[in-house]
């Protein structure tokens, strides 16, 4: 199974990049970050035309994630358990059957958090990581094959 993570920075503005990705790498699953589109405006038909099923969780102007796949997933989760409708759309998960095995793929657009002293952004980053850790611990009890991918917004130095 070929799996690709791609920060597209506006899915409606870059269908040509998805076509190029399909033609050069031919992934089975593409995890997209920064779709920057509300769900009702997501380009479902355009994605279908290039050969992919789409699951998405977005909001206008920023954030937003999607999972594009050649085969429809068995199960999809949008956001973490306990997220409110006002939470940023940063996490999507899909479970696929692949060669008689179940594979759960988590795709996130992780908050960058500014710096540790930022009063709102850094706590949101910590909450996202805590939610993800708790989610993975819960999944590990029943799932064998887990993949976490996305734009982690982490750099080892200030040169990002």
Predicted feature locations:
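Short amphipathic alpha-helices and their capping/turn segments at secondary-structure boundaries
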Residues: 20-22, 90-100, 131-144
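Structured beta-strand-rich core segments of catalytic domains in phosphoester-bond hydrolases
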Residues: 35-36, 42-117
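N-terminal, active-site-proximal structural segment of metallo-dependent hydrolase catalytic domains
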Residues: 1-52, 57, 62-65, 156
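Soluble or luminal CAZymes and related metallo-dependent hydrolases
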Residues: 10-14, 86, 124-131
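A short secondary-structure junction signal
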Residues: 116-121, 157-160
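Hydrophobic anchor at the start of a short beta-strand
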Residues: 3, 73-75, 146
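Active-site-proximal beta-strand elements of phosphoester/diester hydrolases
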Residues: 1-10, 102-115, 149
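Metal-dependent phosphoesterases centered on the DNase I-like endonuclease/exonuclease/phosphatase
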Residues: 29, 50-51, 128-160
